[in-house]
Structure formats: C-alpha cells, structure tokens
UniProtKB/Swiss-Prot annotation:
InterPro entries per record: Acylphosphatase, Acylphosphatase-like_dom, Acylphosphatase-like_dom_sf
Catalytic reaction list: an acyl phosphate + H2O = a carboxylate + phosphate + H(+)
Residue ranges occupied by any Acylphosphatase-like domain in the UniProt entry: 3-88
Active site: 18, 36
Enzyme class per UniProt: hydrolase
Pfam family, one: Acylphosphatase
SUPFAM superfamilies per UniProt: Acylphosphatase/BLUF domain-like
EC number: 3.6.1.7
The protein's name: Acylphosphatase
NCBIfam families cross-referenced by the UniProt entry: PRK14446.1
Name of the gene encoding the protein in the UniProt record: acyP
Amino acid sequence: MQAARFVVSGVVQGVWYRASTRERAVALGLVGHARNQTDGSVEVVAAGSAAALGALEAWLWQGPPAATVEAVTRTPCAVPPTEDFVTG
C-alpha cells in the first residue's frame, strides 16, 4: 500500500470538493481524508494502490463541476491510520 498527500488549490471550498473527493476515493478503494485548510486549499491524504492514487490525482485536477482547480501538489506520506475515507 502506498500513500500520498495532495494539496489542491483554487476555488475548492464551498463547492462540494471534499464530498466529491470522498466519493471518488471510496470508488477507487482508497482510505484517508479530505480536509479544508485555512488558506482556502483542500488537503487530501490517501492510501491504496499506485494505480488508484494515480486515478485520484487525475480526478483531483477536475473536481466537481463548481470547482476551479489551479494546482495539485503531491508528496509521499505515511499511510493514514484509518480504514475509511472521511471528510473533516
């Protein structure tokens, strides 16, 4: 299992970005979280197969219809201690 931390910036808060990310992550079999950050970005930490992480990263660039994604950064991280994907 691999894990990655993504930081998504742009118009990504107040547009159902976290909930949509959770739906996509669960469909891909990933665990982790999506959280709003004080700077207006969304942090996504996800763990699963390399292919699923790649598919999530590609989706993060699109997001839900109301979002405008300007940047997605990816860094490796520790596997999150959860068996689900949550928003918070």
